[in-house]
């Protein structure tokens, strides 16, 4: 999109992301927006500083309630629309039905933490770590009447692993490993003390990032670390960059 904006002669590209930019010593840094509840820098961690210098974020210093008041004052047609929690450009729709148009899902076994098969899933890609809903696991013989949660997925064998209890230790990780790492502005090496955020609107926790080994160790355990999602790093509300989670470290 930025290439197109340049092609038509635009000097800048404005987006509706809740994010901010800081300019220091001819460098461009990505910073959290003033509305920390809506901050979207997590989604922008793979954009480079060379691209950010052409971006404008008009919502950087506005909260969502303030944006709504502006929309009402100028009578925008969507001024009373509820907040969206769907994926951008996909919208509010049944995700399973949407994905079924592009992916053939195969059922597979649901396995408990004692390696017993206790059910069948509709396709392991449809489930996420920490998920409770949709497992369709009834009463299991000789097991307590507690809810089941996904704690691991084996994509190669199309298997789903579950445990009982929201606070089961199997759901928590002491760290994670990364597939790759992208820096937005400054590059780092060795070990870096910073904060890591593992999903949108999730509390960032202090950590030590080993840049050379692509490993992260948390100061406190984090629940439901999910391979394939992003781990994004911050220092004093500046988004340093991030990477794709390869695996949990327990």
PLM-predicted stretches and their roles:
Residues 2-239, 243-250:
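Nucleotide-activated chemistry modules centered on ATP-dependent adenylation/adenylyltransferase
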